[in-house]
C-alpha cells in the first residue's frame, strides 16, 4: 500500500513538473517579420488603399523594425518594396531592392532577373 501511494505521488510530481516547465516555455520565434506585410500587399493589389509612397514609407519602417529585432524579412518583401520604388520613380533603389531579394531568396532569381531585364538592368 505504501509503495502504491509513493508511486502515485511520484507520478503526480512528474506531471506537475512537466506542466510547470511547459507553461514557462517561450513560444518559438517566428522565422520572418511579417508585421503588416500581407495587409500592405493586399492594399497595393486592391488599388484603393493608401498611396504607393505612403505604403513604401510604411514598409521601410517595418524593415527598420525587423532589423532592430534581428528578424528576417519575409520572401517577397524586398521585391514588393522594389515595385513601390519603381512606381515612385526611384529606379536605382528599386534595382537595389530586386538584387537584395535575389540574394536573400535565390529561388526568386528568375523573377528578379525578369524585372531587372524589364528595367534595362540585365
Report the location of each language-model feature.
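Bacterial Sec signal peptide processing site at the extreme N-terminus
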Residues: 18-41
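Helix-turn-helix repeat elements of alpha-solenoid scaffolds
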Residues: 47-61
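Flexible helix-coil transition and linker loops at the boundaries of alpha-helical arrays
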Residues: 29-30, 63-72
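TPR/TPR-like alpha-solenoid helical repeat scaffolds
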Residues: 45, 109-122
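Sec-dependent bacterial lipoprotein signal peptides
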Residues: 1-24
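Structural register within alpha-helical repeat arrays
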Residues: 80-81
Amino acid at each position: 500500500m505504501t509503495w502504491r501511494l509513493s508511486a502515485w505521488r511520484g507520478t503526480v510530481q512528474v506531471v506537475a513538473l512537466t506542466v510547470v516547465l511547459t507553461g514557462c516555455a517561450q513560444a518559438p520565434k517566428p522565422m520572418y517579420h511579417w508585421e503588416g506585410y500581407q495587409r500592405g500587399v493586399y492594399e497595393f493589389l486592391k488599388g484603393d488603399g493608401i498611396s504607393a509612397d505612403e505604403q513604401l514609407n510604411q514598409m521601410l519602417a517595418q524593415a527598420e523594425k525587423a532589423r532592430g529585432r534581428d528578424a528576417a524579412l519575409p520572401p517577397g518583401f524586398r521585391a514588393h518594396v522594389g515595385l513601390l520604388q519603381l512606381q515612385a520613380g526611384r529606379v536605382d533603389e528599386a534595382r537595389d531592392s530586386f538584387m537584395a531579394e535575389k540574394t536573400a531568396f535565390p529561388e526568386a532569381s528568375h523573377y528578379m532577373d525578369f524585372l531587372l531585364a524589364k528595367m534595362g538592368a540585365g
